[in-house]
Amino acid sequence: SSSAASDVYKRQEATTEAAVDRFHSLAGELRDTEAALSHTSQLMGAVVKYAKTRPVFDGYKAARYSKKYLAQHEAELSDYRAAKAAMSELLDGAKLPKMDALKKRRRELSEKKKALYAEYRKAQADMREAVAVKGNIDFLRGYPDGREDKAQER
């Protein structure tokens, strides 16, 4: 009977480990998806700001970089430079995708995040349950931290 109990315990240990691994794996995937979503949204924001301020910059160029024009449009030109720098940093040498492609990517990432989050919550509940069950078994078996060889380790 002790061997049957030992098998049950080993199965519970494996179940717990798998539940913990799944939770951590989903947490990582969720983090990566959120980072990609944030990156895409930032890039879209920079593209919009760039498009809005580009005509002002073109006007500045056409005015041969006149101090008077600069003084009249300082805020827009500053926004233009900031948007251009943000795009350059976010793209990191890559080609700028079309706005439609960015919108599609943001939509897909948003849906993926939603689905992942639901899986993540379930995995979290499964993990908590498995850890609690294992903890109860450990307690009943008299292993405060789930280790039989604790005394030998010291």
Residue spans of the language-model regions?
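Coiled-coil termination/hinge junctions
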Residues: 121-154
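Conserved phosphate/pyrophosphate-binding and hydrolysis machinery centered on Walker-type P-loop NTPases
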Residues: 16
